[in-house]
A protein has these predicted regions:
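Targeting/processing segments of secretory and organellar proteins
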Residues: 3-10, 347
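Intrinsic disorder/low-complexity segments
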Residues: 1-4, 19
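Short hydrophobic alpha-helical segments enriched in small aliphatic residues
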Residues: 13-16
């Protein structure tokens, strides 16, 4: 018998041959005559899997201002950053979301995680240096003078920059638009992108005509109508004239970003994108396909050491039943669109694919949220923990004169008269005009009183399920509130057992199954490397899914 190890030769002077890591192979070799050759095929080879250690940088594109920028980092500056990453021996460049976030045309739109379209790119990232020069010399000089002023600022003036860029793009469109829209390259691109581009363009036009992105307030076209598509794509129609400006801008953005992506590949730099968990509730995505969203709730996060009252992001939550019914088409398209610009991506708040913290629309803080989906308790289940269920007591804000006295001191009587009314026995309840946090936010000017009233609204032991009123969820962090301290020691112990079971055990396998309905479809949609941001209140099932699907997780050595 003969023994052998397979080897792979690397034809590079710095690399040694790679040898198999398995035991030597034992083979029976017949006697061969001179000149005879025998070939043997092995079905498996055992080589060490490469375990590279790659360094990278995370940066928002808007911060990449260079000498030639127009007051904000753009896709041309991204190429400069790619050069620096490659020069320093790094391999990964991650950027924050670059989708359009334009709702009000003010600085409030500057938050990159509140996109109005999962496809459209933000017009502020257009690199004017890659466009034809303005033929109007006077206008060109004016814009150059403004560019120098905006670029000299220590911080980005979001409103002035975006106003100037919109005006410049309008002039370029008037100058070059007809030629670009008639080009073969544009027509080919438009055919591939029009499924989202046409509704997006109409949404932008209607947003500006109506002076608001809240489509529920528009005079007409409060949802996308597929019958409008024909007029929006016909160059002979009135609707096309204004919509085509947005086609033109998105075409420029797509070409510049794709060029930056290709440049990164040439430099052997992995360009990594960022997919926000939510979308703006007044954005084009919700307007075009409202069936995919729950508008009677807001996404957020439960309390943590950095946010004692939880977080309210304001995004609508997803109607996963509708999304799963059509194979998660909305998400698959989103990921496939990302693949045009990136080689890897970060899933923001991957916990949202297991369950999302859903907050009532009338809430400001996150304490009144509940996980959706999740397994709420029936009355019988609650009582099985040893806690006699009293709905009127457990599900109403606990407010008495004694509570107000502890919170407001000498002002308690005035507060009681202004905001409350008698209810049952010693209890008070909010007057109708102050019975939600949003009403309080709108009507109460004093910040201290406002925050105190917020806390009283959320002073409940249980929350009714948002979909099934016969089910109940324990209110998170209620152990710090007045209602909890009215319980007997036995009831506190019973509630704590129920509380720990609900948040840390009861839903674990249920949430695992929920994630596995969604994430495999999305990961298989592209060849991009998947990374997950899995910080927060992480259930035990999250590492199971992350490991099963070979998703890279976020590992931190330390946190402040």
């Amino acid at each position: 018998p003969e023994e052998s190890d397979d080897t792979v030769m690397q034809y590079h002077r710095h690399h040694a041959p790679l040898w198999e890591t398995c035991c030597n192979r034992v083979m029976e070799v017949p006697v061969l005559r001179r000149g005879e050759i025998m070939e043997m095929e092995h079905s498996q080879a055992f080589f060490e899997i490469a375990n590279p250690r790659l360094a990278g940088t995370l940066v928002p594109v808007f911060s990449l201002r260079s000498e030639g920028s127009y007051g904000v980092g753009d896709f041309g500056d991204l190429r400069v950053m790619i050069d620096w990453v490659a020069y320093t021996g790094q391999r990964v460049l991650q950027i924050l979301p670059i989708n359009d976030t334009t709702v009000t045309h003010t600085w409030k739109d500057s938050y990159p995680y509140s996109c109005i379209s999962i496809f459209a790119l933000h017009p502020q990232y257009v690199d004017f240096r890659q466009l034809p020069a303005l033929k109007d010399k006077k206008k060109a000089a004016e814009f150059e003078a403004l560019r120098e002023k905006l670029n000299a600022l220590r911080q980005i003036d979001y409103e002035r920059v975006n106003k100037a860029k919109r005006e410049y793009l309008r002039l370029i469109f008037a100058q070059e638009g007809q030629k670009v829209l008639a080009s073969t390259e544009f027509k080919r691109w438009f055919a591939e992108e029009q499924h989202w581009l046409v509704p997006y363009a109409q949404y932008c036009v209607l947003r500006d005509i109506n002076g608001t992105a809240d489509f529920s307030q528009w005079k007409d076209h409060r949802t996308w109508n597929e019958e409008d598509r024909n007029s929006l794509v016909s160059s002979r129609s009135k609707a096309y004239k204004e919509a085509s400006y947005h086609y033109f801008v998105q075409f420029i953005l797509a070409r510049q970003m794709q060029a930056a992506h290709e440049y990164a590949r040439q430099k052997h730099v992995i360009l990594k994108g960022d997919i926000p968990i939510g979308v703006n509730r007044h954005g084009c995505d919700v307007w075009q396909e409202p069936r995919y969203f729950n508008l009677n709730g807001k996404a957020g996060a439960p309390p943590d050491p950095f946010s004692a009252k939880g977080q309210n992001w304001g995004f609508p939550t997803y109607n996963w039943d509708a999304m799963i019914a059509d194979g998660c088409r909305w998400w698959v398209r989103r990921f496939q669109n990302m693949q045009k610009y990136f080689d890897a991506y970060r899933i923001d708040h991957v916990l949202g694919f297991f369950r999302i913290w859903e907050i009532p629309v009338e809430s400001v803080h996150g304490l009144l949220g509940q996980f959706q989906p999740s397994l709420g308790f029936t009355r019988a289940e609650i009582e099985s923990y040893g806690l006699m269920f009293r709905e009127d007591f457990f599900c109403r804000p606990y407010i008495t004169e004694e509570v107000l006295s502890q919170m407001f001191g000498d002002r308690a009587e005035q507060i009681a008269h202004t905001y409350f009314e008698p209810f049952q026995g010693p209890y008070l309840r909010f007057q109708k005009e102050y019975d939600t946090q949003c009403k309080i936010k709108e009507k109460v000017e004093d910040a201290d009183i406002r925050e105190a009233l917020y806390s009283l609204v959320s002073d409940v032991l249980f929350l009714r399920d948002h979909k099934r009123p016969d089910l109940y969820h324990p209110r998170i962090s209620v152990q710090y509130d007045y209602i909890y301290h009215q319980l007997s020691e036995a009831d506190k112990a019973a509630f704590n057992r129920l509380y720990d079971d609900y948040f840390y055990h009861r839903n674990t396998h249920f949430w695992y199954r929920e994630a596995m309905k969604k994430l495999p479809r999305l990961i298989e949609a592209t060849r991009m490397l998947v990374c997950a941001e899995d910080l927060g209140m992480v259930p035990d099932c999250v590492p199971w899914v992350i490991n099963d699907l070979k998703i890279l997780s976020l590992e931190l050595q330390s946190m402040p």
